[in-house]
């Protein structure tokens, strides 16, 4: 009789132990997943901080190159010698690029300060879904403004290098090499800033998926 009772109790004990084991596995998996999300979030926060710093630096270089683009030189057309005076502020497209790049510098600086402060406090750089949406939309707007400014300035630079096909105008960049090089450099850095903003947008999407 004792053996029979013992055999009846064994399945119950085994079932209880199995339930405990399953709970332990589930709890361990949940803890592991949370740790992974936390670690991934920290890496994304650091990556976001680095991208903001790089974007601010690159945009600053773009502005600096553009506002220092000025040169006076001489050129010959139809046997006559003319003085050329090139300044970035004479073109609306170049002014637009400077304004957009300056706005990107200011935006990146604000985001950099916020990110750095939160990293020092060991809190999430983007703590809420609403802020993630705001950063995503802002990155998209600033990014497309940068690429539009770079495209507009590229047209001016290309015309300076090739002249105008329907008019016998020379390649002004042969005489204004310093000016054209600064324009080209500013455009390259502006487009690079756009790529950095696009990368920041991807991190914004990751934050949005995490805050579902």
Swiss-Prot record:
Q: Where is the signal peptide?
A: none
Keywords annotated in UniProt:
Cell membrane, Glycoprotein, Membrane, Transmembrane, Transmembrane helix
Keyword Mitochondrion in record: no
Which cellular compartments is it found in?
Cell membrane
Q: List the disulfide bonds.
A: none
Q: Which residues lie on this side of the membrane: Cytoplasmic?
A: 1-45, 115-135, 204-212
Q: Does the keyword Cell membrane apply?
A: yes
**Topology relative to the membrane:** Multi-pass membrane protein
Q: Which residues cross the membrane?
A: 46-66, 94-114, 136-156, 183-203
Gene Ontology cellular component terms for the protein in this record: plasma membrane
The lineage's top-level taxon is Eukaryota
Its primary localisation, in coarse terms, equals membrane
Glycan attachment residues as annotated in the record: 160
Topological domains, Extracellular: 67-93, 157-182
Summarize the subunit comment.
Answer: Homodimer and heterodimers.
Q: Which family does it belong to?
A: Belongs to the Casparian strip membrane proteins (CASP) family.
For this entry, the protein name equals CASP-like protein 3A1
The organism is Arabidopsis thaliana
């Amino acid at each position: 009789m004792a053996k029979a009772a013992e055999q009846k109790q064994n399945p119950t004990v085994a079932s209880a132990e199995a339930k405990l084991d399953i709970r332990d596995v589930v709890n361990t998996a949940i803890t592991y997943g949370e740790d992974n999300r936390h670690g991934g979030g920290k890496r994304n926060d650091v990556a976001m901080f680095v991208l903001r710093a790089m974007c601010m630096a690159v945009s600053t270089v773009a502005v600096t190159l553009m506002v220092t683009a000025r040169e006076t030189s001489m050129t010959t057309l139809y046997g006559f010698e003319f003085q050329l005076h090139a300044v970035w502020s004479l073109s609306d497209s170049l002014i637009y690029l400077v304004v957009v790049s300056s706005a990107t510098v200011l935006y990146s600086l604000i985001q950099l300060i916020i990110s750095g402060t939160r990293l020092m406090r060991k809190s999430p750089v983007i703590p809420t879904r609403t802020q993630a949406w705001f950063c995503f939309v802002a990155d998209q707007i600033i990014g497309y403004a940068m690429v539009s400014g770079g495209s507009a300035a590229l047209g001016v630079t290309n015309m300076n290098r090739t002249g105008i096909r329907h008019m016998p105008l020379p390649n002004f960049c042969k005489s204004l090499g310093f000016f054209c090089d600064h324009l080209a450099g500013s455009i390259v850095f502006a487009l690079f800033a756009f790529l950095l903003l696009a990368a920041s947008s991807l991190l914004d999407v990751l934050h949005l998926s995490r805050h579902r």
